[in-house]
Design a protein with these regions (language model features):
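Gly/Ser/Thr-rich beta-alpha loop segments that engage phosphate groups in nucleotides
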Residues: 3, 23, 54, 90-92, ...
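Short secondary-structure boundary/capping segments
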Residues: 10-11, 69-70, 110
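Conserved sequence/active-site signature of Rossmann-fold short-chain dehydrogenase/reductase
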Residues: 50-52, 102
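C-terminal substrate-binding subdomain of Rossmann-fold SDR/epimerase-dehydratase oxidoreductases
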Residues: 72-203
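Catalytic helix-loop patch of NAD(P)-dependent Rossmann-fold dehydrogenases
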Residues: 1-44, 56, 60
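Active-site beta-alpha turn of Rossmann-fold NAD(P)-dependent dehydrogenases/reductases
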Residues: 17, 46-48, 122
C-alpha cells in the first residue's frame, strides 16, 4: 500500500496500488482462509526491497545497488531521481534487505513448523537512495552522483517511503538480526566485481 496506515500485516494497511500488488494480496487472503485448519505449515513472507547475489536475470527489476554498480562501470557515475512530493534529491527511502538475511528468515520458519501466517520480511529500518549511491561510490573510491528529473509517468504512482513493521516477525522469535547496509553494499559490490554477482564454488 501507500504506507499511510503503516506497513504492518494488518488489513488496514493492505491497499494494493497496482494489479501486481492486488494479485499478491488476493493470494494472501486466499491463504488466510486455511491457516487455522491446515495440516501443513503455511507461511507467507512479504519481501521488501531485496538485494544481493544472483539477481542478474531480473534486468530492470534488479535491485538499485545492482543497477548503480553497473551504471558506475559504464559511465563512472550513479544517477538518482531529483526530489518530489516533499522529498529532497535522492532522499526517497526503502526498506532494503540483504538476500542473506532473507535466507535466514526463511530458515527460521523452516526450523519452527509450529508457526503460521503472513509476515513482513524487511529490516524495519528505511534507508535513502542516497545512502545506497554513496555506498557504491565509496566502494569504487571515485565517481559522480547525478540527479535526474523525476519522471512524469511516475508521479502519483511512486512509493517514496517503505519501512517494514517487523514486530510480528520479532515477536515470533526471529533473532537472526540484519546485516548493516554499508557492510552489505561493500560485500555485494565486491562480489559483483569478482564474479559478476554470482556465487561460485571455487573449491
Amino acid at each position: 500500500g501507500s504506507g499511510k496506515h503503516g506497513f504492518s500485516e494488518k488489513p488496514a494497511c493492505e491497499e494494493a496500488l497496482n494489479v501486481y500488488a492486488f494479485s499478491k494480496l488476493f493470494f494472501d487472503n486466499y491463504a488466510r482462509r486455511y491457516f487455522d485448519n491446515a495440516e501443513s505449515q503455511l507461511v507467507g513472507l512479504r519481501y521488501f526491497n531485496v538485494y544481493g547475489p544472483q539477481e542478474n536475470h531480473k534486468g530492470k527489476m534488479a535491485s538499485m545497488i545492482f543497477q548503480m554498480f553497473n551504471q558506475w562501470k559504464a559511465e563512472g557515475k550513479v544517477k538518482l531521481f531529483e526530489g518530489f512530493d516533499g522529498y529532497g534529491n535522492g532522499e526517497q527511502t526503502r526498506d532494503f534487505i540483504y538476500v542473506k538475511d532473507v535466507v535466514k528468515v526463511n530458515f527460521f520458519f523452516w526450523d519452527h513448523p509450529e508457526l503460521k501466517g503472513i509476515y513482513n520480511c524487511g529490516t524495519g529500518h528505511a534507508h535513502t537512495f542516497n545512502t545506497l549511491a554513496k555506498g557504491v561510490l565509496k566502494y569504487f573510491g571515485s565517481g559522480e552522483l547525478e540527479y535526474v528529473p523525476f519522471p512524469e509517468v511516475l508521479k502519483g504512482k511512486y512509493q517514496s517511503f517503505t519501512e517494514a513493521d517487523s514486530s510480528k516477525l520479532l515477536t515470533a522469535g526471529y533473532d537472526g538480526g540484519f546485516t548493516d547496509i554499508e557492510e552489505a553494499i561493500a560485500e555485494y559490490c565486491a562480489l559483483l566485481d569478482k564474479n559478476d554477482g554470482y556465487l561460485i564454488n571455487e573449491r
